Amino acid sequence: MASLRRLTELLCLPVTATAADIKTAYRRTALKYHPDKGGDEEKMKELNTLMEEFRETEGLRADETLEDSDPEPEESGYATFENVSVPDIDGAFFKLMKLKKCMQTYFSVNERRKQDIRPEYFELFKAFQDVPWKVLEDFFTSEMF
């Protein structure tokens, strides 16, 4: 805490300055005290030391807030790395194949529907054509699971 007070003194900032204010003032003051610019070498060393301490404590605070804000896997919507059962895999496979069959039926040429084809149909048809159905079938039927 004393080092923060000394840092804000050296930077000519109030003690209530934000981290962004401190970083901006540090850049400005570093140019002023830099030995290559004719500044005071001792003050530059002190400024660098205090700024390093500030960055470390700022990093610790950021780590603490990250730890507190990490959602649990079941809350985040992301899958966990638990084992998936064979019935779950089979269920997913059969749902994909049912979707494939429904889409094939939809995309089959029907004389009555030809007059009602809209641009959305063509976009959906192209997306359906781009799905690697053979790869999915091979993946789900492999002995890997």
From Swiss-Prot:
Record-annotated J domain positions: 6-82
CDD domains named in the record: DnaJ
Region entry Disordered, spans: 58-80
Chief place of localization: host cell
UniProt feature coiled coil, ranges: none
Function text: Promotes efficient viral genome replication by accelerating both G1 and S phase progression of the cell cycle.
Assembly with partners or alone: Interacts with host PPP2R1A; the interaction inhibits PP2A activity.
Protein name: Small t antigen
Organism: Budgerigar fledgling disease virus (BFPyV)
